[in-house]
């Protein structure tokens, strides 16, 4: 598709879709809680729909009523062996978390994904789940999908130190631990997003968080809840950056989730000189509205414990850095290489093809700015965040056109992205 270029100031108010991470976990925990769970504000992107369909195939009744998702949970014992392969589409979250959940079930399943997901390593969940007594395997020593899993009603608790910073691996182990008899401990390398821990407790589960160590004594039963999903800060990030780098822009981003394990991007842009104001902050619900205006920015260093708190925002932060004065250095972000694409290489290649000055490193990027950006022919490469980054980049292009292939990938997390973009350009 041909993208909008040479945009004037962006003006208006935006309500971003529901948080993808929280939406997944609401469905997963609701499916094994006892009673009727109702979810408001659920993201209806393709990844979450993959999770919903997986649980329907596992015998859980899930339907939409009055703009809410209603899940009829029967507890951990209520799941039934699927009659077909579970297709997780493009969703690594679905595959890894559901594998953890099915670890304690007395049946076997085969889990597959699309071409992109089939290139993402699952060894990170295979090894701890095997330690708990699950028969699980993928392709090659990296355990690429498809995964074959035989659950075990007599799971063993483990103490596991994560070799990488991964909320998905942590979550897979905790979901299995809810069904294991005894004390499971997960020790993180760096603190990652804690939605699973928070939602287990919201559903009546018990665990202890002590710094980087999470302790859970199983088995436990969960109780159905009413869940309201806040706006996804990872989706809001695209408008946040657009507002900061397009001259004359002023945007109000409504109802954005600001769980502290996800707010790294806000800290980074403020350090770079961004003018942002928080309105209607609700600290208990961890939700706020964010007013952003065009700002003059300077380069910075992004590394260490900050990385897990903004890992999904790094592509759009890279674009931001191309418009900042000086050098921005992103380090310790090697996890980007095993996302939907090798995001370090793809971001570098796309932005450099449009005139940026970026050097890819083994674990990040070195970005020099500010640079003028030009038109190019490019692709999402099947990665939703790459697609949205490119669409925001195109707004800065004053010379040439920008053509984007495989734009349908954006449906993964933000089905109304282009509609919202057009509205902000016209308000």
Curated annotation (Swiss-Prot):
The active site is at residue 312. Pathway: Metabolic intermediate biosynthesis; chorismate biosynthesis; chorismate from D-erythrose 4-phosphate and phosphoenolpyruvate: step 6/7. It is an enzyme of class 2 (transferase). Phosphoenolpyruvate binds at residues 20, 92, 120, 168, 343, 385. It catalyses: 3-phosphoshikimate + phosphoenolpyruvate = 5-O-(1-carboxyvinyl)-3-phosphoshikimate + phosphate. It holds the Pfam family EPSP_synthase. InterPro entries: Enolpyruvate_Tfrase_dom, Enolpyruvate_Tfrase_sf, EPSP_synthase, EPSP_synthase_CS, RNA3'P_cycl/enolpyr_Trfase_a/b. 3-phosphoshikimate binds at residues 20-21, 25, 166, 168, 312, 339. Monomer. Catalyzes the transfer of the enolpyruvyl moiety of phosphoenolpyruvate (PEP) to the 5-hydroxyl of shikimate-3-phosphate (S3P) to produce enolpyruvyl shikimate-3-phosphate and inorganic phosphate. NCBIfam families: aroA. This is 3-phosphoshikimate 1-carboxyvinyltransferase.
């Amino acid at each position: 598709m041909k993208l909008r270029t040479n945009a004037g100031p962006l003006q208006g108010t935006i309500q971003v879709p529901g948080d993808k991470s929280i939406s997944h976990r609401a469905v997963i925990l609701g499916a094994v809680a006892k009673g009727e769970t109702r979810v408001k504000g659920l993201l209806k992107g393709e990844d979450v729909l993959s999770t919903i369909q997986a649980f329907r195939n596992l015998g859980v009744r899930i339907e939409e009523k009055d703009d809410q998702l209603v899940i009829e949970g029967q507890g951990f014992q209520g799941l039934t062996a699927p009659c077909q392969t579970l297709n997780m589409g493009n969703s690594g979250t679905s595959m890894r978390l559901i594998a953890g959940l099915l670890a304690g079930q007395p049946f076997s399943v085969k889990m597959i994904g699309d071409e992109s997901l089939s290139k993402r390593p699952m060894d990170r969940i295979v090894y701890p789940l095997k330690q708990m007594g699950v028969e699980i395997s993928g392709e090659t020593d990296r355990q690429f999908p498809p995964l074959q899993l035989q659950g075990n009603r007599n799971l063993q608790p483990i103490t596991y130190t994560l070799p990488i910073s991964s909320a998905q691996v942590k979550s897979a182990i905790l979901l299995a631990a809810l069904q294991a008899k005894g004390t499971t401990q997960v020790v993180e390398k760096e603190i990652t997003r804690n939605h699973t821990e928070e939602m287990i407790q919201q559903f009546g589960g018990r665990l202890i968080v002590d710094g980087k160590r999470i302790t859970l004594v199983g088995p436990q039963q969960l109780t159905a809840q009413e869940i309201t999903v806040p706006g996804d800060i990872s989706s809001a990030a695209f408008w946040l950056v657009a507002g900061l780098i397009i001259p004359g822009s002023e945007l109000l981003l409504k109802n954005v989730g600001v769980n502290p394990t996800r707010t790294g991007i806000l800290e980074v842009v403020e350090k770079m000189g961004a003018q942002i104001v928080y309105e209607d902050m609700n600290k208990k619900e961890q939700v706020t509205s964010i007013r952003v205006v065009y700002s003059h920015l300077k380069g910075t260093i992004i590394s260490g414990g900050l990385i897990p708190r903004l890992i999904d925002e790094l592509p759009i932060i890279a674009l931001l850095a191309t418009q900042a004065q000086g050098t921005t250095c992103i380090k310790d972000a090697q996890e980007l290489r095993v996302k939907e694409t090798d995001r370090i290489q793809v971001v570098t290649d796309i932005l450099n093809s449009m005139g940026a000055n970026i050097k890819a490193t083994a674990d990040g990027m070195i970005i020099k700015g500010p640079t003028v950006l030009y038109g190019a022919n490019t692709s999402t490469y099947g990665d939703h965040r790459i697609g949205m980054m490119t669409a925001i980049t195109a707004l800065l292009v004053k010379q040439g056109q920008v053509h984007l292939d495989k734009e349908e990938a954006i449906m993964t997390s933000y089905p109304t992205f282009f509609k919202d973009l057009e509205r902000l350009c016209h308000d």
